[in-house]
Regions:
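Multi-bladed beta-propeller domains
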Residues: 2-9, 117-134, 160-178
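C-terminal/domain-edge helix-coil "capping" segments
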Residues: 53-125
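Residue-level detector of Asp-centered blade-edge/turn motifs that repeat once per structural unit
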Residues: 88-92, 140-141, 184-185
Length: 192
């Protein structure tokens, strides 16, 4: 809804007039404000989410973090709003693992294992190799990733810690070592 069409601009519950939003054919209303003390890197984000037709507040809280965490705070709020409307948990704080293949010269490729936000923002390279990388799989605790690398000339499965970058080869079978998948408790890997 364009700002110019809004009848009122509430930033807290006592300023919400449901009739204004019904006139504008809006089913839901999300309002909020960000407070930051001068000279501080901390912000407080206060939001409230309303069902206009039922005239009730569905959710609201104050989230605190650094200025650099505003995107994450926004995604957290998006998860709450999405779940309130759909009854399905939001995925806005999810991260992706994927492989990027780039041309590195005539007949050469560079393969990168990357992670990013669910929308591709904030990509981070976890591994670069001149040999193919495939089948990345998150550990259930989100701290490690298993993947297949051909850096030895043969497919081998590695586990790498996301934070430290430490990695270790865990397979050396003579044939195929592929498609690692973590057990729900994160203590075992299934593979082909």
């Amino acid at each position: 809804l364009p700002l110019s069409n809004m009848i009122s601009l509430p930033d807290e519950e006592r300023e919400v007039f449901y009739r204004d939003w019904r006139i504008l054919a809006q089913d839901y209303l999300l309002i909020g404000k960000i407070n930051q003390e001068p000279g501080s890197q901390l912000v407080q984000v206060q939001y409230e989410f309303f069902d206009v037709n039922r005239e009730i507040k569905l959710a609201g809280e104050v989230l605190t973090g650094s200025v650099t965490q505003l995107r994450d705070i926004g995604h957290t709020i998006s998860n709450v709003v999405f779940e309130q409307v759909t009854r399905v948990p939001g995925a806005f704080t999810s991260q992706l693992l994927y492989i990027v293949s780039e041309e590195a010269g005539p007949g050469l490729s560079l393969f990168k294992l990357e992670k990013s936000d669910y929308d591709g923002a904030r990509p981070q390279v976890l591994l670069e190799s001149g040999e193919p990388i495939m089948s990345p799989s998150w550990s259930p605790n989100g701290q490690d990733v298993a993947y297949v690398s051909f850096e030895t000339g043969l497919p081998r499965i590695y586990i790498q810690n996301i934070a430290s970058g430490q990695r270790r080869q865990i397979t050396n079978y003579p044939n195929t070592n592929s498609s690692p998948v973590w057990s729900p408790d994160g203590n075992k890997l299934a593979m082909v």
